[in-house]
Amino acid sequence: MTAFVVTGTDTGVGKTIFSAALTGALNAHYWKPVQAGLEDGADRDHVARLAGVPASHVLPESYRLNTPCSPHRAAELDGVVLDLARIALPDVRPLVVEGAGGALVPVTRNTTYADVFAWWNLPVVIVARTGLGTINHSLLTIEALRARGVPIHGVAFVGDAVEDSEATICAMGEVRRLGRLPMLGQLDRPALAQAFAEGFRVEDFA
């Protein structure tokens, strides 16, 4: 059954918001294996609020780390050794898995998220900004994933419409253009569900 990994071209591009929207649209389970930074609430808490799925669909993290930085360093600061065996995929479907930061963020000193994605062998949705710099960041992300044999499902944009940038990324990167979420003035479940329905086709995630 359906399962996707959500990564981003950078931190703060809208991965969690998109993950919540996709989780709700698919009535999926959501899992973020490593949460680094707890002060502003965990991403799973935001997804639980925005996705509109049963509480049991929002799975607990394998690791909850205190410092909001790359997981490899957050683990070191907490005195935790990250065991990759503990981030094996849960046996539930449909499933939306959210990474941290971008594809080349280190999970350990020797392993990036892109390496983990290759191990999981699930299709990856790249969440990208539409603003200045996104072409470079997006194409670098595509290259990094392809170099590891990671299947790319497509790119989901977040932000104001920038037709040329969106089209250029997908043409040069030879990836599917899945749609775009606008910036929402009011971020709640009904507004997010409507924005996803207007910007994406759920059948593209079947």
Swiss-Prot record:
<keyword id="KW-0093">Biotin biosynthesis</keyword>
<comment type="pathway">
    <text>Cofactor biosynthesis; biotin biosynthesis; biotin from 7,8-diaminononanoate: step 1/2.</text>
</comment>
<keyword id="KW-0067">ATP-binding</keyword>
<dbReference type="InterPro" id="IPR027417">
    <property type="entry name" value="P-loop_NTPase"/>
</dbReference>
<dbReference type="Pfam" id="PF13500">
    <property type="entry name" value="AAA_26"/>
</dbReference>
<feature type="binding site">
    <location>
        <begin position="98"/>
        <end position="101"/>
    </location>
    <ligand>
        <name>ATP</name>
    </ligand>
</feature>
<feature type="binding site">
    <location>
        <position position="16"/>
    </location>
    <ligand>
        <name>Mg(2+)</name>
    </ligand>
</feature>
<dbReference type="GO" id="GO:0009102">
    <property type="term" value="P:biotin biosynthetic process"/>
</dbReference>
<feature type="binding site">
    <location>
        <position position="46"/>
    </location>
    <ligand>
        <name>Mg(2+)</name>
    </ligand>
</feature>
<protein>
    <recommendedName>
        <fullName>ATP-dependent dethiobiotin synthetase BioD</fullName>
        <ecNumber>6.3.3.3</ecNumber>
    </recommendedName>
</protein>
<keyword id="KW-0547">Nucleotide-binding</keyword>
<keyword id="KW-0436">Ligase</keyword>
<comment type="similarity">
    <text>Belongs to the dethiobiotin synthetase family.</text>
</comment>
<keyword id="KW-0479">Metal-binding</keyword>
<keyword id="KW-0460">Magnesium</keyword>
<dbReference type="GO" id="GO:0004141">
    <property type="term" value="F:dethiobiotin synthase activity"/>
</dbReference>
<dbReference type="GO" id="GO:0005524">
    <property type="term" value="F:ATP binding"/>
</dbReference>
<comment type="subunit">
    <text>Homodimer.</text>
</comment>
<dbReference type="InterPro" id="IPR004472">
    <property type="entry name" value="DTB_synth_BioD"/>
</dbReference>
<dbReference type="GO" id="GO:0005829">
    <property type="term" value="C:cytosol"/>
</dbReference>
<keyword id="KW-0963">Cytoplasm</keyword>
<feature type="binding site">
    <location>
        <begin position="12"/>
        <end position="17"/>
    </location>
    <ligand>
        <name>ATP</name>
    </ligand>
</feature>
<comment type="function">
    <text>Catalyzes a mechanistically unusual reaction, the ATP-dependent insertion of CO2 between the N7 and N8 nitrogen atoms of 7,8-diaminopelargonic acid (DAPA, also called 7,8-diammoniononanoate) to form a ureido ring.</text>
</comment>
<dbReference type="GO" id="GO:0000287">
    <property type="term" value="F:magnesium ion binding"/>
</dbReference>
<feature type="binding site">
    <location>
        <position position="98"/>
    </location>
    <ligand>
        <name>Mg(2+)</name>
    </ligand>
</feature>
<feature type="active site">
    <location>
        <position position="32"/>
    </location>
</feature>
